[in-house]
């Protein structure tokens, strides 16, 4: 009996030690483990309270967006109906169409309106590209061909010292992906939800020579945010607000941080209502201008939309429709692809691409910007997204051309109250 009691006491002590070790382990990075434990119970598109801490990026007073009148209306009632049907069928939360200087359509799903904040996912990358043009123009960075190691001094003495900022903007960095896959303790998960995004990203070593392989990577875009912060000497959100959002934003944005006072998530998670994404698309269409002010250098916009050597469908953190491929993939190490059942109707489609089908399409030749936000993401069985990439812009372009050719007179469009 004494032996049994001693064994029981020993087991109790062991269990206590294990529990204490577990509590200590979790407490050492409680914010990460809280995110990890609650992620599968939240809606990543709309549960803004889950993303904390955040920094508010205050807006300015940009020019009003004109709404189409009887004289400027270009969408037929049939096209509006088709677009609303498309939006509802694909789990959309918002769909905006701006054409020839006027907002032709502004649709929101049930429970959403023009003040609703939504997760932008990787569309944020295309905003980072704009900020690089501003930083170079203001002299914070000498040129796009500056070695990244000028700012990432951790790279000075190894093969990564050959990587330029251009390589990173074009996703031709040659870096290995974060390890661990979906292992909750792996670097990949910590890059997504951890509390030291910069530290995790800096661990990645060179795998290929720079400018040889296209490899779309959140890790790369996170490092671009770190470079921008170190080069300017400002927190990312401050530089964004001072140089872009105060010019283009009609309402505030929110930037997610890994921890209080930490690094901004620059591979995704710029939270703002859809109308601000429309304004960013219009800025692109107007070659960097907002009203009478040149906010982003025109020459930089041209560089952003120039096809890169390793992927003709990618410029600087921004996607291009310049070459037709039935399946557009994300490069080395990513199985997912987006189906393209046909070419784009226009040859100059530029678009911001975010997970779950967050899109801003900019088509200068048609004087057209389309914003779509909502659900409808990846089919994990096939590795394909659940809709054709060209379907939405082609639907709009064909409808606009039909109206133009037939010379129809249209009634002003009135926004619906949702599905």
Locate each region found by the language model.
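C-terminal/domain-terminus segments
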Residues: 371-403
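Catalytic-site signature segments of enzymes, centered on catalytic residues
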Residues: 115, 182-268
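Active-site-proximal alpha-helical segments within enzyme catalytic domains
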Residues: 220-227, 266, 270-290, 358-374
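Active-site helix/loop module of the DD-peptidase/beta-lactamase fold
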Residues: 138-176, 203, 232-268, 272
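Active-site SXXK
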Residues: 101, 118-143, 168, 224-228, ...
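Active-site Gly/Thr loop motif
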Residues: 251-254, 306-369
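N-terminal leader/targeting segments and the immediately adjacent pre-domain N-terminus
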Residues: 2-112, 138-141, 397-419
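Short, small/polar residue-rich loop motifs at catalytic or cofactor-binding pockets
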Residues: 89-92, 116, 355-357
């Amino acid at each position: 009996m004494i032996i049994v009691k001693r064994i029981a006491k020993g087991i109790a002590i062991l269990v206590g030690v294990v529990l204490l070790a577990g509590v200590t382990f979790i407490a050492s990075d409680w914010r990460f483990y809280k995110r990890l434990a609650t992620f599968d119970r939240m809606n990543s598109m709309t549960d803004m309270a889950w993303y904390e801490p955040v920094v508010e990026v205050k807006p300015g007073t940009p020019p009003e967006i004109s709404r189409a009148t009887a004289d400027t209306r270009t969408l037929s009632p049939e096209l509006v109906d088709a677009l609303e049907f498309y939006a509802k069928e694909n789990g959309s939360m918002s769909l905006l169409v701006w054409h020839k200087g006027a907002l032709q359509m502004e649709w929101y799903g049930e429970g959403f309106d023009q003040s609703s904040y939504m997760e932008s996912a990787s569309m944020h990358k295309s905003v980072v590209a704009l900020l690089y043009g501003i930083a170079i123009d203001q002299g914070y960075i000498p040129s796009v061909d500056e070695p990244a190691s000028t700012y990432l001094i951790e790279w000075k003495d190894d093969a990564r010292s050959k990587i330029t900022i251009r390589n990173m903007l074009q996703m031709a960095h040659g870096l290995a992906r974060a390890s661990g896959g979906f292992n909750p303790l792996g670097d990949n998960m910590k890059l997504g939800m951890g509390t030291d995004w910069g530290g995790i990203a800096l661990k990645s070593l060179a795998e290929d020579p720079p400018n040889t392989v296209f490899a779309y990577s959140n890790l790369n875009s996170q490092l671009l945010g770190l470079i921008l912060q170190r080069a300017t000497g400002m927190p990312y959100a401050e530089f964004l607000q001072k140089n872009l959002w105060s010019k283009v934003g009609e309402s505030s944005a929110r930037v997610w941080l890994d921890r209080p006072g930490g690094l901004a998530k620059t591979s995704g998670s710029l939270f703002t209502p859809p109308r601000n994404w429309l304004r960013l698309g219009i800025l692109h269409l107007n070659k960097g201008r907002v009203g009478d002010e040149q906010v982003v250098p025109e020459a930089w916009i041209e560089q952003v939309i120039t096809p890169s050597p390793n992927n003709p469908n990618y410029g600087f953190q921004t996607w291009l429709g310049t070459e037709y491929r039935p399946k557009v993939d994300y490069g080395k190490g990513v199985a997912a692809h987006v189906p393209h059942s046909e070419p784009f109707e226009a040859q100059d489609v530029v678009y911001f691409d975010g997970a779950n089908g967050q899109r801003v399409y900019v088509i200068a030749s048609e004087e057209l910007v389309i914003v779509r936000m909502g659900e409808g993401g990846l089919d994990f069985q096939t590795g394909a997204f659940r809709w054709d990439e060209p379907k939405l812009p082609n639907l709009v372009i064909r409808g606009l051309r039909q109206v133009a050719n037939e010379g129809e007179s249209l009634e002003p469009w009135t926004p619906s109250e949702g599905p």
